[in-house]
């Protein structure tokens, strides 16, 4: 990591050239780290949450288009013919802008930012805490053991944080999938969405699709963190001198790959979310998998996947931006990969 003096001398361009790879969080459970900086945990949360909030707001229009394409076969207004189907990414962008207004691209973004701050922050913060419970292996001499440790720590961190923020993720999906305009909107905002769904189906209605979400989050986060940390250890001899754009390219490939791999799980959970508090289209997770495959074909599990790849640019940006923010907050922190 750069020292405070070097940071002041180098400026932003020097920081980007000399930055360490990606989201390197400290081993918060390590006595050495916590004694050196008792605020390391708080700084971890602040850096990860800030980076996530910025990137999510930037890619919110792509996120909403992805959700509309992904859930339209479970959207009552579209299924009834009240609102015509979207035929693709471009068609969705054009119609949403003309029918609902440009500002509607950010429907559900508040819930997403509120959700994403603790989700991403806890993912990054607890990943290395969990990883600290496992033996440490070198990516050069014990590649597969190193890979498995990173895969497990990333997956467990994501699954744990999901339990806390799932109602916000649920609300984000329902708000983004609301194709009404003006008085025809189903929900007017985050609080209205949560209160109406609870009134219709009880508190557990906010956890529709949670089971398959846990499966998907383990697959996604496991690949997201595990592959990224593994790629860093294998591709970069000195992480501290890694090129900014090289970091971004690796992060982009990881987020795209992890997103496609876990996308069918995401489609199923979104479909289950859409029926909460209303008419039931599926009797459960297995029934949803079966009906989508039989009635719409396997490609239906990947509706909106291309939008998800584009949105992945924001995820890759988070991985790189996180480290830059963390170094600004805590210039003397030591990268976990360098220990």
UniProtKB/Swiss-Prot annotation:
Solcar repeats lie at residues 39-133, 145-234, 246-328. GO terms for biological process: mitochondrial ADP transmembrane transport; mitochondrial ATP transmembrane transport. The matrix-open state (m-state) is inhibited by the membrane-permeable bongkrekic acid (BKA). The cytoplasmic-open state (c-state) is inhibited by the membrane-impermeable toxic inhibitor carboxyatractyloside (CATR). ADP binds at residues 115, 127, 269. Signal peptide: none annotated. ADP:ATP antiporter that mediates import of ADP into the mitochondrial matrix for ATP synthesis, and export of ATP out to fuel the cell. Cycles between the cytoplasmic-open state (c-state) and the matrix-open state (m-state): operates by the alternating access mechanism with a single substrate-binding site intermittently exposed to either the cytosolic (c-state) or matrix (m-state) side of the inner mitochondrial membrane. This is ADP,ATP carrier protein.
């Amino acid at each position: 990591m750069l020292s405070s003096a070097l940071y002041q001398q180098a400026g932003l361009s020097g920081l980007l050239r000399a930055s360490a790879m990606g989201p390197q969080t400290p081993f918060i459970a390590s006595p050495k780290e916590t004694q050196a900086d008792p605020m390391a945990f708080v700084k971890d949360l602040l850096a990860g949450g800030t980076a996530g909030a910025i990137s999510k707001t930037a890619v919110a229009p792509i996120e909403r288009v992805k959700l509309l394409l992904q859930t339209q076969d479970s959207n009552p207004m579209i299924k009834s013919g009240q609102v015509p189907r979207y035929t693709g990414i471009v068609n969705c962008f054009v119609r949403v802008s003309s029918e609902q207004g440009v500002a509607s691209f950010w429907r559900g973004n508040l819930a997403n930012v509120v959700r994403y701050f603790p989700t991403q922050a806890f993912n990054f913060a607890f990943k290395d805490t969990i990883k600290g419970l496992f033996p440490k292996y070198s990516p050069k001499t014990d590649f597969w053991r190193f890979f498995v440790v990173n895969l497990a720590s990333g997956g467990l961190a994501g699954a744990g944080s999901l339990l806390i923020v799932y109602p916000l993720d649920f609300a984000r999906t329902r708000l983004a999938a609301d194709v009404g305009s003006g008085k025809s909107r189903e929900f007017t905002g985050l609080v209205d969405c949560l209160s109406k769904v609870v009134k219709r189906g009880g508190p557990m209605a906010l956890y529709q699709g949670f089971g398959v979400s846990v499966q998907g989050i383990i697959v996604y986060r496991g690949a997201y963190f595990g592959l990224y940390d593994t790629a860093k250890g294998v591709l970069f001899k000195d992480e501290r001198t890694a090129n900014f754009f090289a970091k971004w390219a690796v992060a982009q490939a990881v987020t795209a790959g992890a997103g496609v791999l876990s996308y069918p799980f995401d489609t199923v959970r979104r479909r289950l979310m859409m029926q909460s508090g209303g008419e039931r289209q599926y009797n459960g997770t297995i029934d949803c998998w079966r009906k989508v495959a039989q009635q719409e074909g396997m490609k239906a599990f990947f509706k909106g996947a291309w939008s998800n790849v584009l949105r992945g640019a924001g995820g890759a940006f988070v991985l790189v931006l996180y480290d830059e923010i963390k170094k600004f907050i805590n210039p003397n922190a030591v990268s976990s990969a360098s220990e």
